[in-house]
UniProtKB/Swiss-Prot annotation:
One of the primary rRNA binding proteins, it binds directly to 16S rRNA where it nucleates assembly of the body of the 30S subunit. Residues 22-41 are annotated as: Disordered. Residues 92-152 form the S4 RNA-binding domain. SUPFAM superfamilies: Alpha-L RNA-binding motif (SSF55174). HAMAP family: Ribosomal_uS4_B (MF_01306_B). Part of the 30S ribosomal subunit. Contacts protein S5. The interaction surface between S4 and S5 is involved in control of translational fidelity. CDD domains: S4. The keyword Ribonucleoprotein applies. This is Small ribosomal subunit protein uS4.
Length: 200
């Protein structure tokens, strides 16, 4: 299954969660897209709830099914709670941390920065969005990319950096100081549904 590249607002409304991170798409029209959107929310089966939760999280991080399932399986081999480990591994993705630092306004925008070679990890260029950043590693912009308008605009509007990151806006550089706690991650996701979905 390929990664979704269609209109993110329409998908956000279908899943009932903001994929842009701004919440505007849900705030403006808090119902599914289509002619009968306001009236077509129906009660989902147990399987439907599990599938919806998986789709929410997969699209939130902009991953295809193969990438998502591979990371899920990796989380299952770690000590601790499978679902929580999965959420934490997702958070360590380079494109996600570029977004969390405020260098991009959306995860999609962060993924483009990484793909186009604008991002350094510990001073070395990394152009793989799924690269897993380790605690203690530093994320920064290439010298030639320091004055990108999209980055400056993103930093200007960002007013929150998670406690597991530090960020120097002048240097446009951040450090992933530690792994996040589950309580610091999205409360809109019930990862136990995803574990149940893949355990069928």
């Amino acid at each position: 299954m390929s990664r979704y590249t269609g209109p993110s607002w329409k998908l956000s409304r279908r899943l009932g969660i903001s994929l842009s991170g701004t919440g505007k798409e849900i705030e403006k029209r808090p119902y599914a897209p289509g002619q009968h959107g306001p009236n077509q929310r129906k009660k989902l089966s147990e399987y439907g709830l599990q599938l919806q939760e998986k789709q929410k999280l997969r699209h939130m991080y902009g991953m295809n099914e193969r990438q998502f399932r591979t990371l899920f399986n990796r989380a299952g081999k770690m000590k601790g709670v499978h679902g929580e480990n999965f959420m934490i591994l997702l958070e360590t993705r380079l494109d996600n941390l570029v977004y969390r630092l405020g260098l991009a306004r959306t995860r999609r925008g962060a993924r483009q920065l990484v793909n186009h070679g604008h991002i350094l990890v510990d001073g070395k260029r990394v152009d793989i969005p799924s690269f897993s950043v380790k605690p203690g590693q530093t994320i920064s912009l290439r010298e030639k990319s320091q004055n990108l308008a999209v980055v400056g605009e993103a930093i200007e509007v960002n007013n929150f950096v998670p406690d597991y990151l530090t960020f120097d806006a002048d240097k446009k550089e951040g450090t992933f100081t530690r792994l996040p706690e589950r309580s610091e991650l999205s409360a809109e996701i019930n990862e136990s549904f995803i574990v149940e979905y893949y355990s069928r």
